[in-house]
Curated annotation (Swiss-Prot):
The keyword Hydrolase applies. It is an enzyme of class 3 (hydrolase). It comes from Microcystis aeruginosa (strain NIES-843 / IAM M-2473). Belongs to the SurE nucleotidase family. It catalyses: a ribonucleoside 5'-phosphate + H2O = a ribonucleoside + phosphate. Keywords: Cytoplasm, Hydrolase, Metal-binding, Nucleotide-binding. It comes from the Bacteria. One of its GO terms (cellular component) is cytoplasm. This is 5'-nucleotidase SurE. GO terms for molecular function: 3'-nucleotidase activity; 5'-nucleotidase activity; exopolyphosphatase activity; metal ion binding; nucleotide binding. Its cofactor is a divalent metal cation. It is found in: Cytoplasm. Its main location: cytoplasm. InterPro entries: SurE, SurE-like_Pase/nucleotidase, SurE-like_sf.
Length: 270
């Protein structure tokens, strides 16, 4: 993978094929000359995590008229992870250089990434050994995705020029401000968010009860350092609040090294 040729890019998301974020990302990259294939869920799939469709068929169809004319686009009835799996096995004739996800309408920070369909789409690429990047605009209200797309174009070029020794997932969050107001880019560690959540009981028009999960962030916690990074490395949550673009390298290996060492030292089962 080198920066002097067009890159083969696979893009997915969790907001659906018609979302403005994925259109802005795909069109920006295609306009720059990259070979872009988009395979997204056919509708909203936010917070579906890494779920897969196993108990009913997946339906998919090619989509025209939404993207740049050079973009090949498909919609899929499954989840974001389904979409990437389907693309890699049934749509693409060649392995992509990168798997991209987003641009998500809303942040994916801290422990929120464990629920994120956007991050899971990128993670599916990583599981297949493909470098991947998840992009999110850190606001549910802001609708200007172009600064994030412009940064995506820059970052894709940098990753092509300086490939990682092993495939890595970069989780990128962009503050919802103009390009001139972005203070810079920070390499961050994953933070921790705590929510106050309730299941609100409601009644449907027929008088039957149902429940709606509602919640809001009540605390952004400075997570204990389990990663052995220097203490001055900021969390993604803190840096995005200071209007920095955040880049957090992620992996799918969830082994707790300290927990492993504790079990080993105490010889629980020897």
């Amino acid at each position: 993978m080198t920066s002097d040729r067009p890159l083969k890019l696979l893009i997915s998301n969790d907001d659906g094929i018609s979302a403005l974020g994925v259109r802005t990302l795909a069109n920006t990259l295609a306009t720059a000359g990259h070979q872009v294939t988009v395979v997204c869920p056919d509708g909203e799939r936010s917070a579906t995590g890494h779920g897969l469709t196993l108990h009913h068929p997946i339906r998919a169809e090619q989509v025209e008229g939404i993207f740049h004319p050079d973009v090949i686009a498909w919609s899929c009835s499954g989840t974001p992870a389904d979409s990437v799996k389907f693309a890699l096995s049934a749509v693409l004739k060649e392995r992509p250089d990168l798997v991209l996800a987003g641009i998500n309408h809303g942040s994916n920070l801290g422990t929120d990434i464990l629920y994120s369909g956007t991050v899971s789409a990128a993670l599916e690429g990583l599981i297949e050994g493909i470098p991947s990047i998840a992009f999110s605009l850190a606001s549910f209200k802001a609708c200007d995705f172009q600064p994030a797309a412009d940064f995506a174009l820059t970052l894709v070029r940098k990753v092509a020029l300086n490939p990682f020794p092993l495939p890595t997932l970069l989780n990128v969050n962009v503050p919802p401000v103009s390009s001139g107001e972005i203070k810079g880019v920070k390499i961050t560690r994953q933070g921790l968010r705590h929510y106050e959540e309730t299941f609100e009981k409601r009644l449907d028009p027929r008088g039957k009860s149902y429940y709606w999960l509602i919640g809001e962030v009540v605390e952004d916690i400075e997570q204990p350092d389990y990663t052995h990074l220097p203490p001055e490395v900021p969390t993604d949550v803190r840096a995005i609040g200071e209007n920095f673009i955040t880049i957090t390298p992620l992996q799918y290996n969830l082994t707790d090294v300290q927990g492993f060492q504790h079990l080993h030292r105490n010889s629980w089962f020897d």
